Amino acid sequence: MNYLKVLAILSLLFIFCGSVYGAGEADSPDINGVNAVIDDTITVENASLTYDKLITSNNCEEVVIGDNSIWDVPIREGPIVENDNTSIPDITLKGENGNNMSFNNPADVFINESFNFQMVFKNLGDATGFQPYIQLIAPDELTHFTVSYSNRKIVPIKVGVFNESTYDNTTGLYTLRDPFTKKEVHGPANSTFYILQYPLGSFTVDAPDAVLNITSGIGVLEIGKLLNFTVTPVFRYGNSPIDDPVNYPPIYGETVTGWVNPVVVKIDKSSSLNEHETATGSNFPFSYSVNINIANGAKIENITITDVIPSDVMYLGSPVLYDSKGRVIDSSLYTIEEPAGNKTGGKLILKLKEAVGDLSTTSITLKYKAYAPEFDNSTGDNITIINSETGEGIAAASTVDMNYTYVNDTYNASNSYSIYLKSLATQKYSEILTGSGQLHPVVPHNLIVYKIDFEISDYFAFDDLVVYDKFDTHKVGSAQKFLSEYEPVLSIYGKTWELNESYYSVVSLGDIDESVTFYISKFLKDNNISTSLKGGYYTNRSVNQGAMVGSLNFVAKVIIHYSNGSSVVSNDLVINHVKTSATVLNTFNTVSDNSYTQLRVPSVTLKKDIIAVNGEIINDTDFYKVYPGQNITFVLDIHFPTGSVNDFIVTDFLPIPLFNLKGFNLVNSTTGVIPKGGYWAYANDSGFLYDENTGKVIVPKIGIDTFNNALSFNFGNTLDNMAHPVDVRLWFTFQVSSEPMADQLNLANLAEMKFKDSIDVVYASSNIVLMLTNEPELEITKYVNDTKILENIENATEVEYNITITNTGHSAAYDINCSWWFC
């Protein structure tokens, strides 16, 4: 056999490749959904060949006809690009609580109900990956999947079920094929194979995490028996934008297992107390609530709830059982064993024959009243709960336990809860008011009304009560000004008084105040209102003088700068701390209590869209069809609630190779005019940001990152002294490239913004626009006109070939280059 001549024959038979490039202008006839037929004749010389099968070529794939071949020849597979860089797909699973859904920390999920979790996709490699998707293998107990990415719905592709029809006797495995990679995928019996495809063509190294929000559900399962599913991240095209599995095979990440714990009951305990604290004494009663949530449609029986009341708390009675709609349940349907009325602590035991869950967040609620007395008498001795000399508060912990039967098996659920018992308790509140009195988010120049409530235990009396209020945010200082024109108002003993400047002092830093201190006891003494603040039973344990409570209201203004000179910007927390302190009467011991409020400045928001194609304004749509050679104009709509933000940068990650950043012009073209390809501009209705240092309009710094195919606009630190909202609209235009890529791909073009607050916490948010690629896609068929001639092939035999090229894609193909070669 002549090796070279055999290769020549084989090359003509099956080694043929077509290349398609979409040019801006057609230099040759185009192919648009029609066939192009090429006839060619070749003379074969010095051939010596025997065979008993025919190999032809269809789309550069071998099609074998016949039985066995004695041919033994190398097959050309195309050039292999040597590159050590690679993409590495990675996936993590996050439950509703933000924790990983691991074996040791499974997600507790109600049977017969839906639950939410997230799949977070990353590229941990050092090269761009293409066409990311997730292989999901889920047991049949997971009843459905609803998927979204950046608020856009993604429809899961159900590949099939691993059942008897997919069982491979040879390997002993249940086997399906991934329709994207054509590779085998194995799974447990009766599990289902899904594909969750991101609408992302390329996924660069520095691209933000791609988060899928998943809603699934489970049916009626064995309680406590862990359920698991697996996810495997894949780059379908590996490190290449085109489907070239020989040179760029799919890249798989590590398979991750998510764990779910089926539950039928969840229980928790809470109270009506603000900040979970109370002054002691019967003048400060509160309610405990035992909240039971039962899975939808689940019937539980033989219910016993045992609520262990702390020995520091006195049960007051009045137990009431409510259903999921807040209706009182007939007391004849349950029994309650109550603690002894003259003893602290004890157990409240409720027995209920049965209950059925629904989709409400709470199926049954048990409420009862209690208070913190002076003594713990649960052991028969009167033990003082709060030391009468120091007045130091304590925590009172309680537990609730529930036993029940579900489908003839007994289960248990429990929870613990603590409240804080104090001699002096303080809570703080804040409210933002406009001139009309309407609620409003906090921004610089707003007025904040602060309210401080305080309660004094029935068994204590205090002198020298002082309220110290500090305007302070960690690291940056104060950004508030106490407004003396709004006189502080003190409410106590059922009356109100305005406090003049004799009864408060301000630590001022000029146009900013650091703190204000209010002298409550001094005011009461100077005005002959009271010499000390005494609890209701302090003077006589048998005579109730009523609850000793008070409140203090005052107004502060938010300033544009902090005391350290930095600006109040988006996402900042405007924080206010309060500390009340007083001396226990007839002692030298001081008691204090703290509280605080925080209000957040609104965040920047981002929206991305396509506004024009080839310079013409277009209407909104879910998917934009894009074709090679088109000029696509994108718009970034960025809303700045106060015009002030730190280190603001917005980065647009453009799909590779759909758009090419090379040659992009860094200079703004004419504002208000749709820019031509490779340019950017402010929109005609855009606002502008101002530099924090110079006060001038900011021209953003343009960044070109060819590695990540990313365009960035860096505005740095911005400041609007009047805190006016600003809407910035940026236009930029790119031409759809003629680089080969797949047809009819749903691609997401992602833009991400990042910025910092005043204490350098970084915030990020992203938005996408969806595009549908319309590319040429050629099918190539080559065959010998007369195959009989091959049966008696000899030197000088003429062989005539037909080559047919068909465009099955959605865009015309130009500059068709057809190549064949002999090896």
What are these regions (language model features)?
Residues 2, 38, 59-61:
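Generic short amphipathic/hydrophobic targeting helices enriched at N-termini
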Residues 3-21:
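Sec-dependent N-terminal signal peptides of Gram-positive bacterial secreted proteins and lipoproteins
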Residues 34-38, 42, 69:
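Short, ordered "entry" segments at domain starts
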Residues 44-823:
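Exported/extracytosolic protein signature
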Residues 16-34:
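Sec-dependent signal peptide cleavage junction
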